[in-house]
Amino acid sequence: MAIDLRPFIPFGRGALSQATDPFRAAVEFTLMPMLITNPHLPDNPIVFANPAFLKLTGYEADEVMGRNCRFLQGHGTDPAHVRAIKSAIAAEKPIDIDIINYKKSGEAFWNRLHISPVHNANGRLQHFVSSQLDVTLELSRLVELEKERKTLSIETARSKDQLDYIVEVANIGFWTREFYSGKMTCSAECRRIYGFTPDEPVHFDTILDLVVLEDRMTVVQKAHQAVTGEPYSIEYRIVTRLGETRWLETRAKALTGENPLVLGIVQDVTERKKAEANKALVSREIAHRFKNSMAMVQSIVNQTLRNTYDPEQANRLFSERLRALSQAHDMLLKENWAGATIQQICATALAPFNSTFANRIHMSGPHLLVSDRVTVALSLAFYELATNAVKYGALSNEKGVINITWAIMEDKGEKKFHMRWAESRGPEVMQPARRGFGQRLLHSVLAEELKAKCDVEFAASGLLIDVLAPITPEVFPGMGHNVPEQRIA
């Protein structure tokens, strides 16, 4: 259904009377879904919706006209996004925002929404104009070029201003290029994206000078490809005259003939490229952590089977140790894998024992954040040591206690981390004939992750473990060298 724009856009006399009107052509050319609302009517209703909007949402014109745009919202729409839009409209300010909207079919989609107020010559608000872009599959989809046209008339200043208005509202720059001469005509938004002044003459070489050297040849090849009449799309980097590197995406197509004219659009996609790079980084980090987790699981399996010959007991031990590993991962997930404090690690790993042995497990020390790998190693070590204490140590009788302390101390002029596990008032302990899983965790995994020295003493008063490690940013994230010294008595 064609919708008349004349009641809402200030054209001159007879501006829409011709089928080849460049403004109408530009609307069809970009296929940009657009709405116009009237804030002077109750509830700021829609008074214009172009065919692209109807196609995007699946609604008919009579289903949207006269309604507030909120009908596109649904249960998945973030209330904070809705509040931001309301605030911008109330303040008569433009806003760019990504929001979840819903089509008539009920299908949700990410809508890159741009809303801009339109004022008259006296500065009075007349309408709100909005453009939409479905960015569900990609963060920044550009408008496709329309079917080939013989000419795109920009003969009058009025027509050119109207075309610039549309592409600027959509944050998309529009340009034309004479294929053989390289002379270009650019919209105001296009000039802003490239950093050109309003009156500066623009040539293809002017743009090419901004393109980074690594991307320049590809841009030239794509530009020459346009003469075939086939549309092309390219992403490339430029360095602005202010020295800022930006990612741009251009889509173009040539109107072939005796004097080919290339029509194109350009959009700044720097933020999208940053998001893609961050996504790739996160994917690599997830893969790395998965490998580390699998290595830890394999180690638990090997150590459990090596020291346990009873299948039922091995299965029980493996399940308990795997549960401890899972609790460590849950703790890291809550902290976005930024590590955890030693206090958090102790509390989580020893929670199953505190309920049974109330007031017999004590912990104290400063707030110290350790890396994710150390978090896992400490969690398993604490759990295994507590399990052994229940079987053979301080928690195997009615009065034994465990004291876990940690501090920063000076060792030979160097700040170091000192942690102690001290059992007392339990039965006399003796050094086992061979190392169990707990000792292997201390001497292999924990010592390696902390770059630490681990001393284990089977004293008559109870098990005593001292861990001494250097202060490094890899192990203690964010910790500087000016750490107050705190000794363990």
UniProtKB/Swiss-Prot annotation:
Reactions listed under catalytic activity: ATP + protein L-histidine = ADP + protein N-phospho-L-histidine
Keywords: ATP-binding, Chromophore, Flavoprotein, FMN, Kinase, Nucleotide-binding, Phosphoprotein, Photoreceptor protein, Receptor, Repeat, Sensory transduction, Transferase, Virulence
Annotated InterPro entries: PAC (IPR001610), PAS (IPR000014), PAS-assoc_C (IPR000700), PAS-like_dom_sf (IPR035965), PAS_fold_3 (IPR013655), Sig_transdc_His_kinase_HWE (IPR011102)
Gene Ontology terms for molecular function: ATP binding; photoreceptor activity; protein histidine kinase activity
In-chain residues carrying the UniProt-annotated modification Phosphohistidine: 288
Post-translational modification comment from the UniProt entry: FMN binds covalently to cysteine after exposure to blue light and this bond is spontaneously broken in the dark.
Taxonomy, superkingdom: Bacteria
Root EC class: transferase
Residues with S-4a-FMN cysteine modification: 69
Name this protein carries in UniProt: Blue-light-activated histidine kinase
A Pfam family: HWE_HK
Chain ranges of the PAS domain: 19-93
Domain PAC: 93-147, 232-281
Function: Photosensitive kinase that is involved in increased bacterial virulence upon exposure to light. Once ejected from an infected animal host, sunlight acts as an environmental signal that increases the virulence of the bacterium, preparing it for infection of the next host. This photoreceptor protein is directly related to the bacterium's survival and replication within host macrophages.
NCBIfam families: sensory_box
Region (HWE histidine kinase domain), start-end ranges: 285-367
Record organism: Brucella abortus (strain S19)
EC nos: 2.7.13.3
